[in-house]
Amino acid sequence: MAAIRPRDLLSDGLLERLGGTSLAARAAAGGDTPAILSRDIAKLGEVGYLNVALPPEFGGLGCTLRQAACGQRRLARSAPLTASVVSAHLYWTGAAADAYRTGDNSVRWILLEAARGALFAGGHATAGGDLHFADPHSRCEPAGESGYRFRDPAVLASMTPAWDWVAVHAVHWVPSPGAARPDAVLAFAGRGSRCTPAFRIARVQPAGSPADAFTTSAIAWGHAILASVQYSDARRAFNAAVAAIDPVPAAPAGGHPLDQWPVAEAGLRLDAMKAKIAEITHPWPLVPEQDPDLGGQRLIGIFTMRHEVAEGAARVLDLTSQIASAPAIAAR
C-alpha cells in the first residue's frame, strides 16, 4: 500500500483550479471543453496524479486499486468530467502494474510509456455492444509481421483531448475446422492509426470472459474507478440538493415523510454504493495462483458492483429532484 495516497496529491487549492465541472456550467460560461480538460490533465500530471498506479521503480506511488478509487472519488466531487477522462489512463496503468508484479512483462511497455508522460485512453466500446471485453463488435485482420488492422473503429470513451495511445479491442475469426469462437485481440494504437504492431498487442485469447491477471485486473480497475466517479457525481448532486432546501422547525403534530423519505433513501443508497465499491477494491492486486477463479465469481462480483452503483446513482439523482422540489424540510 502506497505511503502517499492518490488523494493526498489533490489539494483543495488544486481542485479549485480545475475546470472539469459540469457540461451545463461550462456551456453557460462559454468554455472550450477540450482545452479546459487538456489544462486539467496537465495540472494533474504536474502533481504526479496520473502516475499513482505505477510501481515506485517506474516513478509512481504503487497505489492499490482501493487507493486509486478513493482518489477518483475526491477528484470527481470537484471536477467530474476531468475524473472521467483520466479514468482509462488509471485503469490501464493499474492493470499493467498488477501484471508486472506477478512477473508478467508483456505489458511492461505501458508502464515505461506512462513513466515518460504518455497518456492512455479507452476505446474498446463499440456501437451496439455492451459487453466490451467479452463480446466486442469490432473486427480486425492480420497486417504486417504479427500485427493487426482494425476495420471499424471503436468508440473513444475517454482522454479525448490528450491521449497518446488508445486501447482497441476486436475479434478475429481464424478459419479452421476446430475454431468454435474467434480470438479477441486487445491492443493499443497511436493517433491516426488503425494498425497495431506486434509489440503493442496486449492479449490475443479466445473471445469470452477474461481469465488472466491483466485483463481481469483491467476490468476490476476500470469498473471500480468509473463506479467511483458515478458515486461522487451522485453524492455531489445529493449534497447540493440538501444544502439548497430551507429547514423549518418541526410541527408538533407529526412528521413530514413525503419530504424526509427521499433524503433518507438517497443517503442509504449512497452508503450502500460506497460499501460495494470498497468490497470489490479491497482484495486487489490479486496473484493468479492465490485466486484461480479470476474469470468466474470474481468477475460476477465486479459486474454486480458496477450495476448496483449505476442503478443506485440513477435513483439518487431521481431522489434529488424530489428533494429539490420540496419547499422545506422539517428539522429534527
Name each region found by the language model:
Residues A2-R7:
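Intrinsic disorder at enzyme termini
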Residues D8, D12-L15, G19-T33:
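N- or domain-start disorder-to-order transition segments that initiate the globular core
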Residues A24-D32, A272-E308, D318-A324, A328-I329:
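C-terminal helix-coil-helix/basic helical segment that borders enzyme active sites and/or dimer interfaces
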Residues S38, A42-G45, N51-S158:
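Glycine-rich flavin
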Residues H124-T126, P142, A154, H169-H172, ...:
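Short, structured patches in soluble enzyme cores that scaffold and shape functional sites
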Residues P153-S193:
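A short core secondary-structure module
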Residues T196-L270:
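Glycine-rich beta->alpha junctions and the first turn(s) of the following alpha-helix
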Residues S232, A264-D271, F303, H307-A314:
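Generic structural signal for well-ordered, non-transmembrane alpha-helical segments
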